[in-house]
Amino acid sequence: MRQVCILVEGQTEEAVVKTLLIDAAKARDIYLIPIIVRTSLTPAGASRGGGSWKHYDRQLNDLLSQSHWDVIGLMVDYYGYPSGAPGFELPEAPGDQRQLQIVAALKEHYPDPRFHPLVVLHEIESLILAAIRAGGGRGLLSEKTIEHLIRAIDDAGGPEKINNGEKTSPSKRLLALEPEYGKTSTGISILREVGLAVVLDRCPVFAAWWRTLLSC
């Protein structure tokens, strides 16, 4: 059984991996584990989630030094991409070109062939939007919210096209419409409702990364 780890930004990403990806990986004889980035060490233990790039860099280098991993993945949002990270200084570019350039910069900085980074367009909540567009979320979100989000997704050209504005990124839209929305509760329930295949069908950037991860 191949061993694959994915360094993730926080608890939402960890829950996405556990909910959508682990069983699919197991079916391909892959042992998959999400690892939340450690941001600090305190007497109470490690703090995890987000933070500056130095935390990612330290942990990525540590994982890449371990020979038992067949693949080391990374899952980090395009929205709020950490300053100091490879490719951060790149100027805005048409369409998704800057995201592709950032991924290329990450691969150049960490040239280990086992390393496969994903810079999520534009946040991990894009997967939730994909599930909502496919019919998920009824009973968990109001019909008004669902209708509003479907219009936004269609106007943008798909859930991964919902942009990275301070008030218009996927998570900000969800929270503005549904103040009680829980990233690791409501969102994960919606994903569980529709399943992985539906999300992959509507999120081609995420799907391409996932299929590459499986085939390595």
Where are these regions (language model features)?
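C-terminal accessory helical subdomains adjacent to catalytic cores in phosphodiester-
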Residues: M1, E14-P43, Y56-C216
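Non-catalytic terminal and connector segments of soluble metabolic enzymes
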Residues: A46-W53
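Catalytic nucleophile-elbow at a beta strand-turn-alpha helix junction centered on a G-D-S/GDSL motif
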Residues: C5-A15
